[in-house]
């Protein structure tokens, strides 16, 4: 049953992000073979990664293509992925199966799906941004302090600005309770900004309010 759920989830994620086909990293565009400033190179995959906490309590893990694949002349898709309740970033990325693994490692596999997209859809730079609330619940995080929705908006704008030299746009994605991140972003904006090209809910639209959000999506 867990394997079936994993396969269904993978199909949903790939469909959601492929359906339609401010500080900066650098003052000059990266050419293929160049390193993104401030990023570490994963010794196993070669992917470029940046991990940090954006106050208050937003754990961010950015996974960008390897030096040889990142092309500053191509547009950059920033796929923001708000984690489901109770899940860690490591679980969400996934890993090769080993005996004794926690089963959570094998139900999302966003890391493998990202690599698949990079290998098959080469018209852009695929950058996956994992967004984990320190409370492991975006709903709880939003209620933990004032102006939290505007902090979500600020976080999205910061990430966009970080890649401003590379023709970026934002694609908002969420799984389960991660939908609260998207609703917080929508609540903080009077209309959906033009830099957001797609919004996807993977079983995460529990708090949907048609009057509150419907018109914003129609615009």
Question: Which residues does each predicted region cover?
Answer:
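The feature captures the conserved acid-bearing segment of alpha/beta-hydrolase catalytic domains
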Residues: 190-219
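Gly/Ala-rich beta-loop-alpha elbow adjacent to hydrolase catalytic centers
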Residues: 174-178, 182
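Bacterial N-terminal signal peptides
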Residues: 8-16
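A domain-start/cap signature at the N-terminus of enzymes
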Residues: 21-78
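Alpha/beta-hydrolase active-site loop
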Residues: 111, 130-165
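Active-site signature of alpha/beta-hydrolase-fold catalytic machinery across serine-
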Residues: 184-188
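Short, surface-exposed "cap/lid" segments of acyl-processing enzymes
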Residues: 55-61, 66-123
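Bacterial N-terminal signal peptides that target proteins for export
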Residues: 1-8
């Amino acid at each position: 049953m867990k394997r079936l759920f994993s396969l269904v989830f993978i199909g949903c994620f790939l469909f959601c992000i492929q359906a339609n086909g401010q500080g900066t990293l650098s003052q000059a565009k990266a050419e293929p073979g160049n390193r993104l400033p401030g990023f570490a190179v994963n010794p196993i995959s070669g992917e470029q990664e940046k991990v940090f906490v954006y106050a208050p309590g937003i754990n961010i893990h950015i996974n960008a293509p390897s030096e040889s694949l990142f092309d500053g002349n191509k547009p950059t898709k920033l796929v923001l992925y708000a984690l489901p309740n109770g899940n860690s970033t490591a679980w969400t990325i996934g890993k090769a199966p080993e005996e004794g693994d926690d089963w959570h490692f094998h139900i999302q596999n966003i890391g493998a799906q990202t690599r698949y997209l990079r290998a098959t859809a080469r018209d852009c730079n695929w950058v996956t941004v994992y967004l984990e609330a320190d409370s492991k619940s975006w709903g709880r995080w939003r209620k933990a302090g004032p102006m939290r929705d505007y902090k979500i908006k600020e976080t999205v704008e910061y990430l966009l600005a970080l890649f401003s030299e590379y023709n970026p746009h934002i694609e908002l994605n969420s799984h389960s309770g991660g939908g609260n991140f998207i609703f917080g972003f929508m609540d903080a904006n009077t209309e959906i900004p033009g830099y957001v090209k797609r919004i996807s809910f993977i079983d995460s639209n529990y708090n949907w309010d048609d009057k509150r959000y419907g018109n914003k999506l129609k615009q």
